Swiss-Prot record:
Catalyzes the methyl esterification of L-isoaspartyl residues in peptides and proteins that result from spontaneous decomposition of normal L-aspartyl and L-asparaginyl residues. It plays a role in the repair and/or degradation of damaged proteins. It comes from the Bacteria. The lineage of its organism: Bacteria, Pseudomonadati, Pseudomonadota, Gammaproteobacteria, Enterobacterales. This is Protein-L-isoaspartate O-methyltransferase. It is found in: Cytoplasm. The gene is pcm.
Amino acid sequence: MVSRRVQALLDQLRAQGIQDELVLNALAAVPREKFVDEAFEQKAWDNIALPIGQGQTISQPYMVARMTELLELTPQSRVLEIGTGSGYQTAILAHLVQHVCSVERIKGLQWQARRRLKNLDLHNVSTRHGDGWQGWQARAPFDAIIVTAAPPEIPTALMTQLDEGGILVLPVGEEHQYLKRVRRRGGEFIIDTVEAVRFVPLVKGELA
């Protein structure tokens, strides 16, 4: 049984078009309040983005569910996340696949996310402090790549790290941003625009 607050959120997500029950089950299983500051715990199950410090945010549950659904994951999918942030999206992915690789440019956020994931007994995650624009070449190729911040254009390194048939989901743009889905087919990349969004920018480089 889930709480009334969780059930209300799941009902809202279904009404917004989220159909993948495995994704919804993962959202119900991950305690979002563990990924926000104490001051925001009462709002953890509201369908809104919340600040997590360092100028970053935890995405609204709808966007987490939408982007995860677009990845078309199977338990065997090899997944790369760019922008670990609070670790919330990471935890959702960890409930759906056997292993998740995640890159975070801000060392403090990476450390906090690792601690939260460990406290929730989610040990099928590898995190790395690094430049998300470069992906994680040593672990490539990936069946699915998700980016939780917006670059002005799609990073070439991420497209090349997709396996055949792989899917990249990310927000793209500066003042006006759109959620894009990129699918690799042979030497081609098929790009679809999903919807207008608003994310923090994907900054190049690392931050200690």
